[in-house]
Amino acid sequence: MTLLRSVLLAIVAASSLPAAANSCYVTAETSGAVPPPVVTEKCFEYQGMDDDAIDWVCQDNEAVKNSRREIRDSCPSGHFGICTAAITPETLANERATGSQATDTPGPTTVPREARILTYHYESTDRAQARIDCESAGGEWSQ
């Protein structure tokens, strides 16, 4: 009876832990008058990876001015486009290093072959450029 009670208590305790974050919301704005400032607002998430894999790349870094990263449970609705690309070891450190941009450097094989990064775009000074950047890096654009 005591063993059963301990097992049930362990299950309840584990299920009451906060869920691991699995998305990262990023806002950024360049400064300066020429060229005009570039504003971006996006959220990315990993598929086929552990839920906590995004925690390191989503750390808000004070050294990067005019940029803010926030860990969230999920990306919100309201995007104008989604870029889907393969995750590489480099993507785990820099979410923009995806697909063909990250295939030249051999890395550890700890990333599952089917792992993907989905980047939801909400705000961009040049929406067409967001699609061009996605596709030229080996990603697939959808709306």
Segments from the language model and where they lie:
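Bacterial N-terminal signal peptides that target proteins for export
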Residues: 1-8
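N-terminal signal peptide c-region/cleavage motif recognized by signal peptidases
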Residues: 16-18
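Mitochondrial intermembrane space
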Residues: 20-143
